[in-house]
């Protein structure tokens, strides 16, 4: 988790 795809990234549905 990190505001991204749920893997601690920053790229995904929560861009």
Curated annotation (Swiss-Prot):
InterPro entries: Pyrokinin_CS. Signal peptide: none annotated. GO terms for cellular component: extracellular region. It comes from the Eukaryota. One of its GO terms (biological process) is neuropeptide signaling pathway. The keyword NADP does not apply. Keywords: Amidation, Neuropeptide, Secreted. This is CAPA-Pyrokinin. The keyword Secreted applies. Belongs to the pyrokinin family. The modification Leucine amide is found at residue 15. GO terms for molecular function: neuropeptide hormone activity. Myoactive. It comes from Karoophasma botterkloofense (Gladiator). It is found in: Secreted.
């Amino acid at each position: 988790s990190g505001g991204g795809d749920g893997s601690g990234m920053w790229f995904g549905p929560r861009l």
